[in-house]
Amino acid sequence: MVLSQRQRDELNRAIADYLRSNGYEEAYSTFKKEAELDNNEELDKKYAGLLEKKWTSVIRLQKKVMELESKLNEAKEEITLGGPVSQKRDPKEWIPRPPERYALSGHRSPVTRVIFHPVFSVMVSASEDATIKVWDYETGDFERTLKGHTDSVQDISFDLTGKLLASCSADMTIKLWDFQSFECIRTMHGHDHNVSSVAIMPNGDHIISASRDKTMKMWEVATGYCVKTFTGHREWVRMVRPNQDGTLIASCSNDQTVRVWVVASKECKAELREHEHVVECISWAPESAHPTILDATSSESKKSGKPGPFLLSGSRDKTIKMWDVSTGMCLMTLVGHDNWVRGVLFHPGGKFIVTCADDKTLRIWDYKNKRCMKTLCAHEHFVTSLDFHKAAPYVVTGSVDQTVKVWECR
């Protein structure tokens, strides 16, 4: 490739600047003489540091080209696999495929949580920018922002009807929103530190929250009163989730344990300790997963009649563990993420586990065979949260890169 005279002059000035600013005086004066460069302070300023800038931008572009090439190859592979095969594949086995259907921008800080609405074709994201945003996942349209918290929104949860949304924040409050009028109808105070997790109980009458103050609290939806406090964790409680019928709640903590509590008595039924670092996330197994879990493990529950309940946990030790709550046994450990695990979920069909982590990936696990069957490079930064739609073929992820991505499953 031949350079024009102007490009040649620019390159010569940039080389001269590089030689001079790095102390190669002899080479600089020789080069200046041979390249016939005149003394021009204005031009010298213009080309200061230009060679280094060009060099680093070339490296950046090369990296981008390589990324795009690998995405292109992945997409080609998907087309050859995804076409006719997807018609034959059972929807229970559909998994997210690259590239993402939508990458949605709007948050001004890391996204902390993403969830689907149980009825409408919308999803909701929470962020460190203190806002909650509502998006249409079918069109990718932004719908509205809910404002009210004064610090990072840490978690959000719908009731089963989708009429109420609960949110919690580092501002130490829990808010309840009417999801039809989008008004905040109640604010609950009582925790002494950052409220890291919230969930509306299956009966819709109570909310459970977890905090950096080491406690979990249960609140009455109708009055906003705190009716129960669960204590036992020795450190920050990261996440709390009720089981399907609301009789048990699971919590995980910086104390490296997962605990299961009986709601009625506030008693800690099980303390699960095998993780070697902070436990970031937990998820209950749906009944659709029980047959595969029993196949995959010689679970004690087989002998005792009714299986389970089973629980997943993800940790900063980079592993995912599956637990039989009735025995307190760890049934399996899945290893493959290269950084902290931030989200764990069972596929609605029950055969797979879906996880996200600070290694920027979304992974799908065939847990019966204890193998990672697909890895998607999901975001430019840590992936903080994921949700799998219960009925429609979509997965949503949120990231420190401030985006929300919608992935189609097939």
From Swiss-Prot:
Q: What does its UniProt record remark on the domains?
A: Dimerization mediated by the LisH domain may be required to activate dynein.
Its domain of life reads Eukaryota
Question: What subunit structure does UniProt give?
Answer: Can self-associate. Component of the cytosolic PAF-AH (I) heterotetrameric enzyme, which is composed of PAFAH1B1 (beta), PAFAH1B2 (alpha2) and PAFAH1B3 (alpha1) subunits. The catalytic activity of the enzyme resides in the alpha1 (PAFAH1B3) and alpha2 (PAFAH1B2) subunits, whereas the beta subunit (PAFAH1B1) has regulatory activity. Trimer formation is not essential for the catalytic activity. Interacts with dynein, dynactin, nde1 and ndel1.
| One term under GO cellular component | cytoplasm
The principal location of this protein is cytoplasm
Q: Does the keyword Transport apply?
A: yes
- InterPro entries for this protein: Dynein_regulator_LIS1 (IPR017252), G-protein_beta_WD-40_rep (IPR020472), LIS1_N (IPR037190), LisH (IPR006594), PAC1-like_LisH-like_dom (IPR056795), WD40/YVTN_repeat-like_dom_sf (IPR015943), WD40_repeat_CS (IPR019775), WD40_repeat_dom_sf (IPR036322)
List UniProt keywords, sorted A-Z: Cell cycle, Cell division, Coiled coil, Cytoplasm, Cytoskeleton, Developmental protein, Differentiation, Microtubule, Mitosis, Neurogenesis, Repeat, Transport, WD repeat
- What is the protein named? Lissencephaly-1 homolog
Assigned protein family:
Belongs to the WD repeat LIS1/nudF family.
Q: Which HAMAP family match?
A: lis1
Q: Which GO terms describe its molecular function?
A: dynein complex binding; protein heterodimerization activity
Which SMART domains does the record associate with it? Answer: LisH (SM00667), WD40 (SM00320)
Q: Which GO terms describe its biological process?
A: cell differentiation; cell division; establishment of mitotic spindle orientation; microtubule sliding; nervous system development; reelin-mediated signaling pathway
Name the species this protein comes from: Tetraodon nigroviridis
- Asked if the record carries the keyword Cell inner membrane, the reply is no
The LisH domain is annotated at 7-39
Record's function text: Regulatory subunit (beta subunit) of the cytosolic type I platelet-activating factor (PAF) acetylhydrolase (PAF-AH (I)), an enzyme that catalyzes the hydrolyze of the acetyl group at the sn-2 position of PAF and its analogs and participates in the PAF inactivation. Positively regulates the activity of the minus-end directed microtubule motor protein dynein. May enhance dynein-mediated microtubule sliding by targeting dynein to the microtubule plus end.
